[in-house]
């Protein structure tokens, strides 16, 4: 409070700048409630008109079921169907009214039915456990609601159900409420997740220990500073990841500092002085108490954007007031090029280096870097068909992590005929350090990727590891432990620190250069890790 909305024109300009600078293929519009943004439908259509040719998909955070419309779904699926999350939050209409989410079950089912009809096969649902006034019946209603949502699909749909534990927060109507303790949270979760056992439902939940700790700090006071320092000294790190959270160590920190964590999870009296009372959020204490009473009666407090001011105390209607964005009067025109016939692709072959720090990029990471760089370059790309369109790029080989190369190759398809010299100029400005286009040629239409037969490597070691006798013994062998037959290889040992390795390639079961060197010269893992391997060429 008060509601403040950014202008759609500003959002369009910022997204254009961000996409051009990063080359990302997905854009997320982040807000607490995306469906409540006044210009959402207009903004989505304009973003998709601009981004569909570049195959940029749009995703939204969790939506209230009553704000999901066919128009929003139609825009979201224009490139690909990104994840869709609905937030029923509670299993019954009664409990949703308590938290001022007046969502009848039929509205939730209608939204799910629309999403499945629009082609989504997976929906994500979010529920909270331990809400104020919650009863076992409210929790028991969650699995049946999930199954009803599944039944709104005519196909074999999937549901991902996330279960979170309620944590009272300061400056809210529930800031006085008790938070469920660790054992209660485990009990709530046990009953619900058992009811969600279904081959088409995947349930996820937050760690009860994380909820307990977050609850303590959410309504804590300055005494928790010494607890935080003690926990750090005891070795607590990265506690947001459940595998790193050490609850016993946190309990030790509370014990050493003499602070009772359960003190912060208890029910508070409305007359109690709260640790955050000296902070003025604008919302009066009287308004929060009145909202608390309305919640327990199941009475809705309407949205002040639609039903007028509710006198929360934030707005003075002079300097501070609602700031809503008015959608343009007319819908944006779709770009003419979007409906044009697809262009005839033009293929180019690029030769590039992978040196220095770039050698630590795995092949999939390198592919991702090229995809983003191609988008950032502004070149007219051609995209693949299917669920997840990507730039049409074909890599001729996958270089092992840690190996450098002077001459890797890939083929890329463009929508226009360009001078080959223009491609290195466009790409080298945006490729990561160590990756550089050194040659580009235009290919005939039907030319297949080359079948590589030989790779030549230059290998250097900081210590004398390459024994000429070991190389000669290897070349004289009939078999090799890594494969069923000895790979065709040529070794030239210049001195014990330098060698040149020629590896003959086959259609399958090729030996990795590191494996070959390790077995030929009986190297340890540490010795192999210190080698500097440079791929000179492939033919």
Regions of interest found by a model, annotated:
Residues 339-356:
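Residues forming anionic-ligand binding surfaces in small-molecule and nucleic-acid pockets
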Residues 165-170, 381-415:
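Short, charge-patterned binding micro-sites
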Residues 406-458:
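Ordered, amphipathic secondary-structure segments that act as subunit-interaction surfaces
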Residues 38-39, 68-72, 94-99, 129-137, ...:
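Flexible glycine/acidic-rich beta-alpha junction loops that bind and position SAM and/or redox cofactors
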Residues 198-339:
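Radical SAM enzyme core and accessory elements
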Residues 16-164, 168:
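Conserved SAM/AdoMet-binding glycine-rich loop
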Residues 342-345, 368, 472-539:
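Core RNA-modification/binding signature centered on pseudouridine synthases
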Residues 358-359, 418-426, 463-475, 507-515:
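Short, conserved charged micro-motifs
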């Amino acid at each position: 409070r008060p509601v403040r909305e950014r202008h759609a024109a500003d959002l369009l300009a910022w997204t254009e700048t961000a996409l051009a600078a990063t080359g990302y293929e997905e854009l997320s519009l982040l807000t607490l409630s995306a469906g409540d943004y006044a210009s959402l439908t207009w903004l989505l259509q304009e973003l998709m008109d601009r981004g569909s040719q570049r195959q940029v998909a749009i995703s939204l955070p969790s939506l209230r079921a009553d704000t999901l419309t066919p128009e929003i779904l139609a825009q979201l699926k224009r490139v690909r169907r990104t994840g869709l999350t609905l937030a029923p939050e509670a299993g019954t209409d009664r409990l949703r009214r308590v938290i001022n989410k007046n969502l009848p079950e039929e509205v939730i089912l209608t939204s799910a039915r629309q999403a499945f009809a629009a082609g989504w096969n997976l929906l994500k649902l979010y529920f909270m456990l331990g809400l104020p006034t919650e009863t076992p019946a409210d929790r028991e209603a969650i699995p049946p609601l999930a199954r009803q949502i599944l039944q709104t699909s005519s196909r074999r749909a999937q549901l991902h159900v996330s279960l979170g534990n309620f944590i009272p927060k300061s400056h809210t109507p529930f800031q006085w409420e008790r938070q469920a303790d660790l054992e209660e949270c485990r009990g709530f979760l046990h009953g619900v997740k058992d009811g969600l056992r279904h081959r088409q439902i995947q349930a996820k939940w937050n760690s009860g220990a994380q909820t307990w700790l977050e609850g303590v700090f959410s309504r804590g006071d300055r005494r928790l500073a010494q607890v935080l320092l003690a926990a750090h000294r005891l070795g607590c790190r990265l506690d947001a990841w459940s595998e790193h959270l050490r609850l016993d160590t946190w309990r030790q920190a509370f014990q050493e500092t003499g602070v009772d964590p359960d003190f912060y999870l208890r029910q508070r009296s409305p007359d109690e002085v709260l640790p955050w009372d000296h902070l003025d959020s604008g919302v009066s204490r009287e308004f929060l108490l009145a909202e608390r009473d309305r919640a327990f009666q199941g009475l809705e407090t309407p949205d002040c954007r639609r039903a007028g001011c509710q006198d929360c105390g934030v707005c003075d209607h002079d300097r501070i007031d609602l700031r809503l964005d008015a959608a343009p009067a007319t819908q944006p025109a779709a770009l003419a090029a979007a409906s044009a016939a697809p262009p005839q692709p033009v293929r180019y072959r690029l030769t590039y280096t992978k040196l220095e720090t770039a050698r630590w990029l795995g092949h999939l990471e390198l592919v991702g870097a090229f995809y983003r760089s191609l988008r950032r370059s502004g070149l007219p790309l051609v995209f693949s068909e299917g669920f997840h369109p990507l730039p049409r790029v074909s890599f001729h080989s996958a270089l092992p992590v840690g190996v450098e190369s002077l001459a890797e190759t890939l083929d890329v398809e463009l929508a226009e005929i360009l001078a080959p010299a223009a491609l290195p100029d466009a790409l080298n400005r945006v490729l990561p350090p160590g990756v550089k286009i050194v040659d580009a040629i235009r290919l005939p239409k039907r030319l297949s990727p080359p079948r590589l037969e030989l790779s030549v490597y230059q290998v250097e070691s900081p210590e004398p590891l390459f024994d000429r006798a070991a190389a000669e013994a290897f070349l004289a062998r009939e078999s090799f432990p890594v494969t069923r037959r000895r790979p065709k290889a040529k070794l030239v040992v210049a001195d014990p620190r330098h060698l040149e390795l020629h590896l003959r390639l086959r259609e399958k079961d090729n030996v990795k250069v590191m494996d070959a060197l390790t077995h030929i010269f009986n190297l340890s893992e540490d010795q192999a890790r210190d080698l500097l391997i440079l791929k000179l060429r492939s033919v």
